[in-house]
UniProtKB/Swiss-Prot annotation:
GO terms for molecular function: thiamine binding; thiamine pyrophosphate binding. It comes from the Bacteria. InterPro entries: Ferric-bd (IPR026045). It comes from Haemophilus influenzae (strain ATCC 51907 / DSM 11121 / KW20 / Rd). Pfam families: SBP_bac_6. One of its GO terms (cellular component) is outer membrane-bounded periplasmic space. Residues 1-27 form the signal peptide. SUPFAM superfamilies: Periplasmic binding protein-like II. This is Uncharacterized protein HI_0131.
Length: 346
């Protein structure tokens, strides 16, 4: 496949809560966004959309798993219009449960063909706005202090006893990043071998974080030697000066598709459709790396990629099965098994 300052008026309290508002007092309606991307991308995206279309736009930021739980809890009284960012699977699961409104964007034909398929398969409930490569980042300075000379290159290198308490990965109950990792291991090796690996990895994990982004920040600061997650988060930390080496594991790896969808019962449906169109457009996607400090691979074929974006054609990627691993029962079963056999196991 080929991939060819206006200030935001918002109170400190709202920013601390992860909610921002943009648009004029006489705006053409409203839009409430549940956002599972980074806080800066959430803020940049909603601000730019609100200013371009004169829509009073607000967002609440949470991880994909937490947002899914919120959307499900609010199904009889939806509090938002759009779900933007984060991994595709939870949004696909929400669609399966009737929590997402189908919408085929006018920009769908500009999206990389293979990335249109999840949307088509699910009935155009969720559209793909970016791709993120799963891997890990290694703090080389902290690794050297452990007396380890060679940077780990494979998933199974992370089970090295010398790395006890030195690895961080998110919790799949709250973070779509971690569920993507879990589903990737199962697709790489089969369920039994995948869970054997996770059990062997467990003593080396210092923390299962709530957010998938946190391990990148903690490894960048030297609070962990290795963080598992999407490599664009680690690329940003490295660009900012962190002593990180980014690793695409030797066995192969999976990837996320960042999703955007309209919530069932959206009160501002026309603005929600407009937002999805904009998020899939060249302009909306390029905003991610030009202003939003997000270095994912963009899915719009007309969009300019970040100079640091990976070329997926050169990576050893699995054929990630979004249909199977985005299904409600499959996702629920894998997460429950992980909780019982890994996280809570003695």
């Amino acid at each position: 496949m080929k991939f060819n300052k206006i200030s935001l008026s918002v109170s400190t309290a709202l920013l601390a809560a992860g909610l921002a508002v943009s648009g004029s007092a006489n705006a053409k309606g409203r839009l409430v966004v549940y956002c599972s991307a980074t806080n800066i991308l959430c803020e940049t995206t909603t601000k730019a959309f609100g200013e371009k279309y004169d829509v009073k736009t607000s967002f609440i930021r949470n991880g994909s798993g937490s947002t899914f739980a919120k959307v499900e809890a609010e199904k009889n009284n939806p509090q938002a219009d759009v779900w933007f960012g984060g991994t595709f699977d939870p949004q696909a699961q929400a669609a399966e449960l009737g929590l997402i409104e189908p919408y085929k964007s006018k920009h769908i034909d500009e999206i990389v063909e293979r990335f249109r398929e999840p949307a088509k398969t699910k009935g155009h409930y969720v559209s793909s706005i970016y791709m993120g490569i799963l891997g890990f980042g290694v703090n080389t300075e902290r690794l050297a202090k452990l007396g380890i000379k060679e940077v780990p290159k494979c998933w199974k290198d992370l089970t090295d006893p010398r790395l006890k308490g030195e690895v961080q990965i998110a919790d799949p109950q709250s973070a779509g990043t971690a569920y993507t990792a879990l589903a990737t291991f199962v697709q790489l090796w089969g369920e039994k071998e995948a869970f054997d690996f996770l059990k062997e990895l467990h003593p080396n994990v210092s923390q299962y974080t709530k957010s998938g982004i946190t391990p990148s920040r903690n490894s960048a600061r030297g609070e962990a030697t290795i963080g598992v997650g999407f490599l664009h988060d680690y690329a940003l930390e490295k660009r900012n000066g962190a002593p990180l080496e980014l690793v695409v594991p030797c066995e192969g790896t999976g990837y996320e598709l960042g999703g955007v969808s309209i919530l069932k019962g959206a009160r501002n449906i026309d603005n929600a459709k407009l937002f999805v169109d904009w998020a899939l457009s060249k302009e909306g996607q390029e905003l991610a790396w030009k202003q939003g400090d997000s270095l994912q691979i963009l899915t719009n074929t007309t969009a300019e990629q970040s100079p640091t974006a990976f070329d997926p054609n050169k990576l050893k990627l699995i054929n990630y099965d979004f249909e199977k691993y985005g299904a409600t029962e499959q996702r629920k079963a894998l997460i429950e098994k992980w909780v019982q056999e890994v996280k809570l196991a003695k």
